[in-house]
Every structure is written in structure tokens, then in C-alpha cells.
Amino acid sequence: MCGSALAFFTAAFVCLQNDRRGPASFLWAAWVFSLVLGLGQGEDNRCASSNAASCARCLALGPECGWCVQEDFISGGSRSERCDIVSNLISKGCSVDSIEYPSVHVIIPTENEINTQVTPGEVSIQLRPGAEANFMLKVHPLKKYPVDLYYLVDVSASMHNNIEKLNSVGNDLSRKMAFFSRDFRLGFGSYVDKTVSPYISIHPERIHNQCSDYNLDCMPPHGYIHVLSLTENITEFEKAVHRQKISGNIDTPEGGFDAMLQAAVCESHIGWRKEAKRLLLVMTDQTSHLALDSKLAGIVVPNDGNCHLKNNVYVKSTTMEHPSLGQLSEKLIDNNINVIFAVQGKQFHWYKDLLPLLPGTIAGEIESKAANLNNLVVEAYQKLISEVKVQVENQVQGIYFNITAICPDGSRKPGMEGCRNVTSNDEVLFNVTVTMKKCDVTGGKNYAIIKPIGFNETAKIHIHRNCSCQCEDNRGPKGKCVDETFLDSKCFQCDENKCHFDEDQFSSESCKSHKDQPVCSGRGVCVCGKCSCHKIKLGKVYGKYCEKDDFSCPYHHGNLCAGHGECEAGRCQCFSGWEGDRCQCPSAAAQHCVNSKGQVCSGRGTCVCGRCECTDPRSIGRFCEHCPTCYTACKENWNCMQCLHPHNLSQAILDQCKTSCALMEQQHYVDQTSECFSSPSYLRIFFIIFIVTFLIGLLKVLIIRQVILQWNSNKIKSSSDYRVSASKKDKLILQSVCTRAVTYRREKPEEIKMDISKLNAHETFRCNF
């Protein structure tokens, strides 16, 4: 609600100011608007709460703030409060004519307009901190542009069939492009890769002919060669293409981006015309090297983005890196060049993924032997001229642009996305919002450029910052532009006509508690080298650096200082009978932390609400009394222990006792309790562990033996079922089976008496083992 109200409030000011009705009617209208919107009653009135001591500092707080320059303006009978929103200043008795409130102006000169595609060509904007300005930018595409089309072809061996197709594209393409342009020109250039290892073979037999292994006559590899400047002579173009030979390299990626940058920036060599639509057609079937790839060849010098053609050959190919995508995009946009990637094979998607990073580019897939090349160029051109996008160049520090495109079909899109399907009869509008957040920006440029991508016209936006007041310039006698309650005579200087601050004499560093800390702890403003702290509804902010307050103390159960104390400088000052960092503990609770020696937590902790919290992590116990590894007082003063029994001591030792050990004579006491837990006999512990281990082992052996005996007993019982007994008279007939004898032992084998008559077995029953 507050944001929309403020926007409406500011917009009304701008409109009224542009009507030039004078300051009185303007500020009276501002007062009415602020009363209606209730801004004067808002909880977050940063104007009044800031304690701004000058008009400039007041206006820098936000677009709703005004400054009263009236000399006798007094609020509350104590001191001047000149910074507030307009409605409050008027209600406090400040006359309308005495209120400083610079408005936002957008000035569009109508005379001397030379642009035909982008209007207005120039805009002048006056801004104040926190305010924003709006204007409309119109872009109207022309019907028949002059067109410059430059073919940049990958002439590696795999592109042989596509290069042959170029011999016949000239006339056919000229006829098709005549529908879109009355003035069409063609140019040609070739590229391969950097002529160093590992990109090409440097073998003596292959250095000049990379195709020698295939019995082909190839031209030497090269980074980029400009073959033919842009010309209307189609026959000359076809002859240049016909003379072109293929070349070769080793690795798969090519040096396309290197060649593209040179073709873009070498304007005079290529013959780019300022008034023409510039198209760069890149034909390839492989990816391109990116920045840093050339480090593999020991090339570490970054690409400088300049033209380096000598005799139409790129001479820095082996000494400078490939350009980055960002650098390439910048050079293409700066030179108004649209790129068409004509890619054959599976690498088409690689280039398609790059389109969002290269504004004004299109990718198309060419068929075998480039049969669809002309149609691809025509379709790409139609798409390019039907898209209208803008971007901001030459950004001004501290100034922010928000651009929305209003397309012919009524849809709204972000400026970088732009509009599509725009015809030569359409007009695209761009709603431009310019915002300045603060005034503490010095130096730099004071204008920005809004550039439609691919167009040769731009809009220049001049920015003027309203960061000072008229009273500080020439109107104000003493007291109008400043609040003297914050200042001293060394900083605040006035003459008969005006007052000003000698801010160079007082550095803001004096308002910092430390060089890494914000000015006035971020809770005040630095005026004449002193902090003026903000007024906050939560409480009082004070201190030399506004570092103290009476509201940021810790809470306990929802109450500041548990309700048992007051907050001073961020620390709780407890009432009588209470203690603790939050005043949450009764003072009597401290008695529960005193040990038998009268020490609080044995000197190794702090008492928190009747319980010891050991500060030494080695201490344990209710009173932190146990600390096996602590360095005890006896150890620290062991050399002085003999002073407690001075008999038979030498004079030197007695002198030492009187000096370094004198304090101990007054404070010593005998501690009869052990610092450590009582330690049992190690030998006894050893024998106990040994006996227990032995008994456990013996028990395991007995259990295992019993299990084995039980298992054997069960097996003997089961074998008794197979006893065989026979009388001497009986005859046992053996079956024709083969058996093996198995011998095993047991503790008490049971005898088995068997009487088996012998039989003569037939040979067929004999067993062979």
C-alpha cells in the first residue's frame, strides 16, 4: 500500500511540475495528495526519523522527503525538524514557498530529430534520489533495408561439398533478396584454426599441405583470411568462391569465433556500410574453440578485440587467445552485426544453445551439399528483421533501467526479449523506467545508450542528478539549509547569502568505530565528523558511533531483561536481588554454587541461576571440583612449598621466599582432598582381568566339548540300526553292489559280531576300485 501510494504521490508531482503552474500550486497539491494517502501518518517516516542535518541529506533519504528553509520554523519548541514529508511540514507551519522539493523532469527535444527508426534520439532526465522517471521509446523498422551479407566459411576438408555449392548461390540469392532489399552486396572470407600444434600437424611434409595423406592438394592452414570485400558484383563473388581451396587441421573444433570477431571489427576491410543491415553468415560443420582453449598451445595473451588484418590475413592468430562469448557478443552488438549460423550435422544443437548468449543471432541447419543454403539465408533474414529487441549500453553508475516492450499485438514483454513477427508497417513501443537510488556516486559518465539490436540508430539518455538544494546554491541565508543543533562553527560556515558545509575538512572515517565498520554503526548519519543517531520507535540510539541503545538487550520469556532490569548500552542492568546476563536469576541462587572451601564453582566455572557451568572443559562435577588434568596450585607453586617449613634453609632460598613467594604465605591452605579420583592397584586389576578371562575361556572349552560328545553319541545310536547277525547255518546272499571300506575312530567302539558264509562270486560281480 505504501509503495503504490508513494508511486502515485511522486507521479502526481511530476505531472503537476510539468504543467509549470508554479511552486505554490505544486506543493499545495502535494500536501493534498499526501493527506489523502495518509503518508504523514505512516509508521515508517524515514524523513523525520533520520535527523538529517542538511537539505541535501534530507532529499537523499527518498522521493517523499522535503526540507523547510523557513528561518523561524520550529517544531516542538526545542529544535528545528526541517526534514519531513510535505504534508507534515505544511501542518507544522512551514509555508509552501519555503519547502525544498525538487521534482523529476523528462525533457524530449523535438527539434533537430534526425532518427527515422528509433525516436526520440535524445532524452534529458532530471532525477532525485529514490525517484524514477518514465518515457516511451518508439522503434519503427524500415521496409527495404540495404543489406550487406558476408560469407565466413570453414574451409576444412569436411566442408568440401558445401564450398562447391557456394559457386552457384550468388545469382539465386540476389533474386530472392531483391524482394526485401533494393541494395544487396556480398562478401567472402575463410577460416580454419590457429596454425600451431596441437591444432594442426607441424610435420615438415604436412605443414603446407594438411591433406597430403589423402593425395589432395590443400591450401596451407590459416586462422582467418579476408578474401573478398562486400560488392554488388555477383560474378566477382562467384569467382572468388570458385578459386577457394580446402585446408585441414587435426582437432575437431575450429577457430570460428576468432574469425567472427575480426570480420566484425575490421569495418573498413570488410566494407560494412553504416546504413545497411549487416549479416554475417558462418558456415561450418564443427564447434568452435572458446576462450582459454589456446592455452594448450601456450598462447596466454587475452584477445584485445581489435582488428589485426595485414594484407587481408589475421596476423595475431598464433599470439592471442580465442575471444570469449561475452567479448564476441559485445563486438557484434557494437558493430550492429546479425549472425546466421549455417551448420551441418549434429553440431547444430551446439550453436543453437549459444543463441541466448549472442543476441541478434540465428542458427539454421543446412542439408547435404548445402542444398537449402539460399532458403536458409532468406528465412533467417526475415526472422531477423521481424524481431525488435533493445539493450542498454554505456551504463551510468547508480542509474537503473527497466524496459518493457509493448508489441503491436498488445502483449508486454521484457525489453531483452522484445517483440516478434513485426512487419515494416508496425511500430514497437518500449516503456523505459529510469531510477536513481542514491547520490553518493561521483565521476563516471552522465549518459546511457539504448540500442535496438541490429539497428544502426540509438537513443541517448542524458542523466542529471538533483542532489542539492536551491537554498544551498544561492537563495538561503543562515539557518535555511541546515539545522544548527548538530553543527559547530568549524563545519557550518555562512555568509550573507548562503550557508555550506566544509565536508572536505571532516572525513566520514571519524564516524566509524573501526575502518571495516559502517558509518555511525549504520544507525545514524555523519555530520561534520560527528554521528547524529537515528530516532527509532523501539527506543533510544546513542553513543559516539551510535553503537549503544536501550532496546537491544537479551530477552527472557518474552521480556526485556526478564522484566528485572533496564537496558543500557546493550547490556542488562539488573534490579536489586537479580543477576545474570538477562537478569533472570535471583541473587540468592548464587549460594548454591559455593563449595565447602567457599569458592564459587571451584574457580573453574560461573554460577548461572544456582548451577555451575564449567568454563574449563576438563572440569566436571556439581561444583566443577574434579579436574584430573588441570595444573593445580600446588604444581604452580611447588618451589615455594619449602617456604612453609623454613628450617635449615639457606639464606638465598629465604630471600626468594620473601620476594616471589611472599604472597603465598598469606593465601596458602592445606587441601586434604584429592584432585583426582582414588586410583586402585594396577596389579590387582591385572589379576582380576586375567582370572576372569581364563574362566571365560575354560567355560567355552567345556561347552564346545560337551556339544561334540553329544553329536557323536547321536551318530552311534543311528548306526546301530544297521547291525547284521547271522548264524553259521544261514547263508547270506550278497547283492551285486560295490562297496568301499570306511574307517573311523571313536572312544569306545562297540563290537559287532558277524558270521557271513563265503560265496564264490561270479566274475561279473567283481568290483574294480
Swiss-Prot record:
Question: By its UniProt entry, which InterPro entries does this protein fall under?
Answer: EGF-like_dom (IPR000742), Integrin_beta_N (IPR033760), Integrin_bsu (IPR015812), Integrin_bsu_VWA (IPR002369), Integrin_dom_sf (IPR032695), PSI (IPR016201), vWFA_dom_sf (IPR036465)
Which compartments is it annotated to reside in? Cell membrane
Please list the residue ranges that the record places on the Extracellular side of the membrane.
43-684
Glycosylated residues (UniProt): 233, 402, 421, 431, 456, 466, 648
Summary of the tissues where the protein is detected: Placenta, kidney, brain, ovary, uterus and in several transformed cells. Transiently expressed in 293 human embryonic kidney cells.
Disulfide cross-links:
47-65, 55-469, 58-83, 68-94, 211-218, 266-307, 407-419, 439-467, 471-491, 471-494, 481-494, 499-528, 511-526, 520-531, 533-546, 553-567, 561-572, 574-583, 585-609, 593-607, 601-612, 614-624, 627-630, 634-661, 640-657
Q: Give a single Pfam family match.
A: EGF_Teneurin
- Residue ranges occupied by any I-EGF domain in the UniProt entry: 471-495, 499-547, 548-584, 585-625
What does the UniProt keyword field contain? Calcium, Cell adhesion, Cell membrane, Disulfide bond, EGF-like domain, Glycoprotein, Integrin, Magnesium, Membrane, Metal-binding, Receptor, Repeat, Signal, Transmembrane, Transmembrane helix
Assembly mode: Heterodimer of an alpha and a beta subunit. Beta-8 (ITGB8) associates with alpha-V (ITGAV) to form ITGAV:ITGB8. ITGAV:ITGB8 interacts with TGFB1.
Q: What is known of its domains?
A: The VWFA domain (or beta I domain) contains two cation-binding sites: the ligand-associated metal ion-binding site (LIMBS or SyMBS) and the metal ion-dependent adhesion site (MIDAS). Unlike in the other beta integrins, the cation-binding site adjacent MIDAS site (ADMIDAS) in ITGB8 is not functional due to the presence of two Asn residues instead of 2 Asp residues. This domain is also part of the ligand-binding site.
Protein name as it appears in the record? Integrin beta-8
Source organism of the structure: Homo sapiens
Q: State the organism's lineage.
A: Eukaryota, Metazoa, Chordata, Craniata, Vertebrata
Q: Which gene encodes it?
A: ITGB8
